[in-house]
Amino acid sequence: MQFPKDFLWGTATSSYQIEGAANEDGRGQSIWDVFTHAPGTVKDHSNGDVAIDHYHRFREDIRLMAKMGIRNYRFSISWGRILPDGTGAVNEKGLAFYSELVDCLLENGIRPFCTLYNWDLPYALHLRGGWLSPDMPEWFANYTTIVADALGDRVKDFITINEPQCIIGSGYALGVHAPGLKCCAADIVRAAHHLMLAHGRAVQVLRAHVPGVRVGYAPCGDPCVPYTNSPEDIAAARKEYFTVHIDEKVGPAWNIAWFSDPVMLGQYPADGLVGYEQYLPDGWQEDLKTIHQPLDFYGQNIYQGQWWRRGADGKPEHVRYPAGHPHNALEWPINEDGLYWGPRFLYERYHTPILITENGMDAHDAVSLDGKVHDPNRQDYMHRYLRALGQAVADGVPVLGYFYWSFFDNFEWAHGYQERFGLVYVNYQTQERILKDSAYWYQQVMATNGENL
């Protein structure tokens, strides 16, 4: 398997899921601090107050990354650690933490990729409306300015927003993630618009404040995978992938085109406007000029895929997985072809290099009697998905890199600590770190630039 010589092999994490130190050094509350302390919100009744204590252990954690051969690492910044109230006074201790983190990465030969927003909105801003507020884009631009000025001399790779669909879909439509709202379609559409406008303002700030910056955006979604390689099934899968279905309950919260076309093409998808234009804020057409900023890469978080084919009526038809089809511990179906067709369809539509910002497998890992963590299913998952990604590269899709989610086991949002995605096993009682077998396997993949796949 051949990957470009400058292919970016890496791993990813996010602030709330690993940092801990929730009440230390001036950090302000986030919506996840409040949400996880409410009864019934997290399956194992846990929270991220301590998480894996990365805030205090980042130096040893980064040394572990270097030992494993990691050369690219995507982390996110806790907005409330920088600005406890979301706006106003800057917490210098928070800035110092991220500055030291970046220095440590660079000292260990690791290139930092900074995600500005990975779901942990300052609670003070939620009380002022959160993503429902039209002021959010400017609040986000102000926060981005502070980060850019503090880190931009050393960090040149930024991702504005991680998984906008989950932010809106899980947090504002279904209410299963912070802030736990179940909004009407009108509010969902407006919140999504404010989020994309915030992305655009952040790109403008980064271009103005960070010389030589490279900027991307990281939506998610389950690619529609052709059931067969027939032209009819390929066309059906492509059509379904980008179709906006009108849903007055959740709006366009989970749609890839609704959250990508404005950013990448400068327009909302026409089929979505049929149902949702009535909910967009005044001046939305003018806002598109800000939302649509030139990007250096288009990030994608891909874990699975769904089969589609041309139905007897000529329309796309979903094909269910048969009994016994492999799934991960979260019951997400394993379909490696998603990491072929997703990048291919997305590049055909957006004509921007693709960066796989997340891909990984959840399992209920445990330490064996020999003191090691054996996870052959994760190795097989990665092997299959990376071969599919390599085929996309061979077929002409410009894929810049692959970031495995996640480097560590961590706090997995509403699932708490029972689900483990990491290459590194974490004992949450002792904070011991153990490299899993998959970590050593991925080490060899990175060392050979994928030639051993």
Give each language-model segment a name.
Residues M1-V42, D85-T87, L95-G371, N377-L453:
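Active-site region of glycoside hydrolase catalytic domains
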Residues R57-S78, Q293-F297:
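Catalytic domains of carbohydrate-active enzymes, especially glycoside hydrolases
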